[in-house]
Structure formats: structure tokens, C-alpha cells
């Protein structure tokens, strides 16, 4: 698998904020639709501020790409997760494991995939948006 990631705007010391992270979730969801992905698994990790038996704890769902942002917005409304959160992780994964878009716990974004359309599309979008982009192989 190949990885690309970003956590910074070029030439700035501040990391990505919640608005930038939400924009990248929307951008990735749009890219998924454009390349013909029909469904993805979206999830948020365990939130220690919620009771263990909360119906909102650790949400996970399989949705179409056009429902991705709505899933995360619902998690924000339910106080399970927040765009730009520094301690809680979330992700958008292929049900077959062929890619993972990871929203890290340090406001970092990582795409792991072998699909060059996804990697090239996000790399180009991030560079156009002025992000520092790192690349590595597993």
C-alpha cells in the first residue's frame, strides 16, 4: 500500500483546523463518487466522555460517498467527535480494505491505498490547496 498524508499548510506552523478537515472529508467523498466507489465504511473511535452504553458510542456505518459528511456531522451533533479533534480518531474505509482515509488524533489526514486515482486525486487537491504532502510506502 502507498500512503499520502498532510497535517500542515505550506510555510505555516499551525496545523489543520476543523474547517479544513471538514473540507477534506467533503473533497475525499466527492473523489470517491467521481471514481465510482459505491459504498464506504465510516467510523469514529471510542469517546471516553460518553458512557460505555451510549447509543452514540463508537458509531460505524456503511454509506454511499454522498452520505459521508452527513455521518460525521451527525457525530459532531451527538458530541461523539469533532472535526479537528486532537484526541479522537475517525475514518473512511473501503469495505474490502482497498483504501483507508484516516482522520488522525493529531489533526493529520492520511490516505492509504493502491488506487492511483485516489492517491493522485488527493495529492493534487492537497497541493493545490497549499498543504505540505508526505508520501511513503508500507
Map each language-model feature to its residues.
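Structured alpha/beta or helical-core interaction and ligand-binding surfaces enriched in interleaved
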Residues: 1-138
Amino acid at each position: 500500500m502507498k500512503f499520502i498524508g498532510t497535517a500542515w499548510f505550506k510555510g505555516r506552523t499551525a496545523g489543520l483546523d476543523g474547517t479544513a478537515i471538514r473540507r477534506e472529508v467533503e473533497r475525499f467523498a466527492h473523489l470517491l463518487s467521481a471514481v465510482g466507489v459505491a459504498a464506504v465504511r465510516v467510523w469514529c473511535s471510542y469517546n471516553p466522555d460518553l458512557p460505555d452504553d451510549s447509543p452514540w458510542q463508537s458509531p460505524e456505518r456503511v454509506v454511499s460517498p454522498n452520505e459521508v459528511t452527513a455521518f460525521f456531522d451527525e457525530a459532531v451533533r451527538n458530541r461523539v467527535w469533532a472535526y479537528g479533534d486532537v484526541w479522537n480518531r475517525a475514518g473512511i474505509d473501503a469495505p474490502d480494505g482497498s483504501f483507508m482515509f484516516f482522520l488522525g488524533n493529531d489533526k493529520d489526514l492520511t490516505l492509504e491505498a493502491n488506487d492511483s486515482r485516489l492517491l493522485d486525486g488527493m495529492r493534487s487537491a492537497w497541493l493545490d490547496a497549499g498543504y505540505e504532502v508526505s508520501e511513503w510506502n508500507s
